[in-house]
Amino acid sequence: MGHILVKNLRKSYPNRRLGRRGAGDPYDLGGLMHILDIPHLEFQENEMVCLLGPSGCGKSTLLHIIAGFDQQISGQVIIDGQVVTGPSSDHIFVFQHSGLLPWMTVWQNVELGVRQLKDAKARQEKIQEYIDMVDLTTFEQHYPYQLSGGMQRRAELARALVASPDVLIMDEPFNGLDFLTQMKIREEIVNMHELFNKTTLVVTHDVDDALLMGDRIVALGGRPAQVIFNRRLEFSRPRDPQKNKALADLRDELFLMLGVSYAI
């Protein structure tokens, strides 16, 4: 489960700059700004897909549409044969800023993912299992403000996975984290993906994150945003561009495509 098909997707917003752009500009649709134009995009079951692209190109908008938060679109998103008409527990969204409820403890936040489980004993066992899995044992009764940024992100990951979704959607999961914490969370996300085999979509600005994590990399670019790169990575993990020339060449290709002439 977790096959995703995007068909004839177009997304527009009211154009507050109407009259400032030239006639015939494809970005200007007579009072609307054309943001996304994706005729066909497919994510296979159990893939981890990393979405790359410059800031403001529509990556997060695409994730919101796939998650069912934004239905003001033309076209369809189909998950496992069903047209997405709104949010669902089958596809869980992890926001780029902490989505933990501040008045709830770690335990209570994770419990939100299994509210439908009626058996109290089974529910408690499952909550503890996932808290232990993300290395937050002994922090069950802590509130979000008592946790570091990385710990908050792990709690969000536990809450998402405990719900057993078919699709896990993550919008910039490393946002606001220091470099070492980013590396740790990245490793945990990859490990969780390999353990649970969930279709996982991750928005990132970091080419290296995409290369190290993704089974597939999709890049958006242009205005309106279109798919300008879509490739499955046939590299085993762990990956190191410094030791793999093909991976290093792909890294350079992605930097150039995103408008960076060299990698620092």
PLM region descriptions:
Residues 121-139, 191:
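Conserved ABC ATPase "signature" region
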Residues 52-54:
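The feature captures the beta-strand-to-loop junction immediately N-terminal to the Walker
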Residues 162-166:
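A short, proline-enriched helix->beta-strand linker immediately N-terminal to the Walker B motif
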Residues 143-147, 151:
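Conserved ABC ATPase signature
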Residues 104-111:
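Short coil-to-helix segment of the ABC ATPase nucleotide-binding domain corresponding to the Q-loop/switch region
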Residues 67:
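Helix-to-loop junction immediately C-terminal to a conserved catalytic motif
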Residues 168-171:
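Catalytic Walker B motif of ABC-type/P-loop ATPase nucleotide-binding domains
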